[in-house]
Design a protein with these regions (language model features):
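Bacterial N-terminal signal peptides
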Residues: 1-6
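C-terminal motif of bacterial Sec signal peptides marking the signal peptidase cleavage site
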Residues: 8-10
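N-terminal substrate-binding region of glycoside hydrolase catalytic domains
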Residues: 15-87, 91-98, 106-132, 353-432, ...
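Hydrophobic faces of well-ordered beta-strands that scaffold small-molecule active sites
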Residues: 20-24, 57-61, 99-103, 152-156, ...
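Active-site beta-loop-alpha junctions enriched in small/polar residues
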Residues: 25-27, 64-66, 104-108, 156-161, ...
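Aromatic-rich peripheral "rim/lid" segments of glycoside hydrolase catalytic domains that contact
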Residues: 32-33, 254-260, 272-361, 587-590, ...
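Anion (oxyanion) recognition and catalysis
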Residues: 52, 93, 195, 257, ...
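Active-site cleft segment of glycoside hydrolase catalytic domains centered on the general acid/base Glu
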Residues: 75, 80-84, 110-228, 241-251, ...
Length: 662
């Protein structure tokens, strides 16, 4: 260990070309509220020297135009203004580190949910707005240059995948050429100021699209087309919003190769489980184009409270006058020390598997049934039988050629306006039923409703326990709930073979935020979060997107064109087909045939009631073997699936399935 210490300390310390960075713009606020940063031995030191001692070499600072404005970030103390930035940048430079400046072009936070125009620029549009942004950018950079603390890298905006300086610079999925030109005109005003004042400083474009390759290409291609420049591609990556690690890896590898630019994960939420994973992924980018990473506000992870009073968090307002001593965490800093020790060897190859491509396969034609009502029926005394012999309902279905069972899941059916005070279709009831499905040797499709009760084209009520969430908070909750639920099923031995991320969602989900209006953008983010939640738990589980448009081709195409353009990752197209809403059998056949030819994805009629043989035959005969099968809805209900009578006995309709010799 002595030799290791000598290698990494002292004047002769080797340097890695890979940058280990962080955004710690909260530091002045923490220190103003009494925080004292200490090294592992409890010796007070400047936080930047502590970080530099552990191989951090690049610190990013955000800057707001006027945080003291009425609706600004820090009306009383002006944190993240120019003066605070100057003072902090001097400390960064004194610690021997590089400095990245992150222009938010707002008086407060700017991110994909919001890009508020600074109060000083209200009323400005067009060239006047561009001139204001140019003058502000030039003034800030000139000040930093004259103070001897010019940044090595500059971001023209923060997480600007939906544009910057709204409303003029706003872009969404319906953005026209003129919208892009306006937004990029604003961007180029900042670009011009950077190039004039600091011609050697790198420009980093910052998009909150860690795993969204399609959207990254769309954005960067528009930039190039309109003369907007970038030297480094910077991406935010937070697991709950930006897809899986494999998606991140795939995106970084592709973007670096396609644009021949370095790539940087310039925001991630560092924790002991993901630091090495994310850094190794970026370090593994071919041709040395993995620039590095920047952990976002990691002080609460890097430091621990000596007395437990803070547990590493920033003190809250009202705690002024107190002293909080935070010691450097040997565990977390040790992770960074270890990866640095590996990265200084230019021949070191990160232990990262190449990006993998999902394979979509199905061995048998699906003859499926939704039997989510069964636990309620059984609790009320229903005994199921076939040809006079009483059997478990799953055995009866299997005897009649059924091989796949669909079960719906509500978030909390016992809530005030929920589906069932007894908890039917809740997690525990659904899990118990799923175990029975697996024990019967059948496959299992899990149908997330993302509601406490029925979700369909006419209603998509947000769960009661989620009403406190909005914006990115609700999107993150979709990911967490999906991910945790799938992990629970897997841990209990009831792994779903396929998952629906929403039920009949052609009008959106989780209303009002996820309701489809003129824009699919909020809904698209939710759907991406749901998909990522499944794939992060088990990348081999098939993902279905389910709409209720069995015979409506125009609506089906419009929907799937949009979600594909919004980078939603899914494997199977699911359609409901009820003749009174979805047209004739010819309408169904024509729609499914077109979808198969157009998208090349497997299709399943995941809900139907009538025309049992005809629907199955239509799906079976779709082009290129893409008709995977069907699920009859509520097979045990005399009113719906009607394969059993009210007493639980099979009826003549069941015999149809024995004739489906697929």
């Amino acid at each position: 260990m002595l030799g290791f210490g000598i290698l990494l300390t002292g004047c002769g310390r080797k340097k890695s070309s890979f940058s280990i960075g962080a955004d710690v713009s909260f530091v002045p606020q923490s220190e103003a509220r009494g925080v004292i940063y200490q090294d592992e031995n409890g010796v007070p030191k400047d936080i930047f020297r502590i970080m530099a001692d552990h191989h951090f070499d690049n610190i990013r600072l955000r800057i707001f135009v006027n945080p003291e404005a009425e609706k600004g970030y820090s009306p009383k103390q002006g944190f993240c203004d120019l003066q605070h930035t100057v003072d902090l940048a001097k400390r960064i430079k004194a610690a021997g580190m590089k400095f990245t400046l992150d222009f938010h072009y707002s008086d407060t936070w700017a991110d994909p949910d919001k890009q508020y125009k600074p109060s000083a620029w209200e009323g400005k549009t067009g060239e006047a707005l561009e001139s204001a942004l140019y003058a502000y950018t030039k003034s800030v950079l000139t000040t930093l240059r004259e103070e001897g603390i010019a940044p090595q890298m500059v971001q023209i905006g923060n997480e600007i995948n939906h544009g910057l300086v709204w409303p003029e610079g706003y872009i969404d999925d319906n953005a026209k050429e003129a919208n892009w030109i306006t937004m990029l005109g604003i961007y180029k005003a900042g670009q011009r100021a950077v190039r004039e004042v600091l011609p050697k400083t790198q420009l980093m474009i910052h998009l909150a699209l860690g795993g969204e390759n399609t959207l990254c290409h769309q954005y960067l291609d528009y930039m190039i087309k309109n003369g907007a420049e970038f030297d480094v591609i910077g991406l935010s990556y937070y697991e709950q919003w930006h897809e899986t690690y494999n998606d991140l890896k795939t995106n970084l590898y592709d973007l670096s190769a396609y644009y021949n630019k370095p790539v940087c994960v310039c925001e991630y939420g560092a924790n002991k489980d993901n630091i090495k994973i994310i850094n190794d992924i970026v370090r593994s980018v071919p041709n040395g184009l993995g620039y590095g990473t920047m952990a976002w506000e990691p002080a609460q992870t890097l430091f621990t409270s000596v007395d437990g009073s803070m547990q590493g968090r920033m003190p809250q307002p009202g705690q002024e006058g107190q002293v909080f001593k935070l010691n450097a965490s040997s565990e977390i800093f040790g992770i960074y020390d270890a990866i640095y020790a590996q990265y200084i060897d230019p021949k070191f190859i990160s232990d990262v598997e190449p990006p993998f491509v999902r394979t979509v396969e199905n061995s048998d034609q699906i003859i499926g049934a939704d039997i989510s009502w069964v636990p309620s029926q059984e609790d009320k005394g229903t005994k199921f039988s076939d040809k006079g012999v009483q059997k478990d309902v799953l055995e009866i279905l299997k005897d009649n050629h059924f091989n796949y069972i669909r079960l719906r899941l509500f978030v909390d059916p016992t809530s005030e306006n929920g589906y069932s005070k007894e908890g039917y279709c809740g997690l525990e009831q659904t899990l118990a039923m799923a175990k029975r499905v697996k024990a019967a040797g059948m496959k299992f499709l899990l149908d997330f409703h993302y509601s406490d009760t029925w979700a369909d084209p006419g209603k998509q009520f947000i769960p009661a326990s989620w009403e406190r969430f909005n914006g990115s908070g609700l999107e993150g909750q979709v990911y967490r709930y999906t991910h945790e639920t799938i992990k629970k099923f897997i841990a209990e031995g009831a792994r779903p073979d396929m998952v629906q991320i929403g039920n009949e969602i052609n009008h959106g989900m989780l209303w009002p935020q996820g309701k489809i209006g003129e824009s699919y953008m909020p809904f698209g983010v939710m759907l991406r979060c749901a998909s990522a939640g499944v794939r992060a738990a088990d990348p081999s589980i098939l993902i279905m997107v389910h709409i209720a448009c069995g015979g409506q081709n125009e609506e089906s195409v419009a929907f799937f064109d949009k979600i594909i353009s919004r980078d939603v990752k899914f494997d199977v197209i699911g359609e409901s087909y009820y003749p009174k809403w979805h047209g004739t059998l010819d309408d169904l056949k024509n729609n499914l045939t077109d979808l198969a030819n157009r998208y090349g994805k497997p299709l399943i009629v995941v809900e139907y009631q009538d025309y049992r043989k005809e629907v199955n035959d239509i799906v079976k005969n779709l082009p290129n073997g893409l008709g995977w099968g069907t699920f009859i809805w509520e097979a045990t209900s005399p009113r719906w699936g009607d394969l059993f009578d009210g007493s639980g006995k099979t009826n003549d309709n069941m015999a149809i399935y024995s004739t489906l010799n697929y």
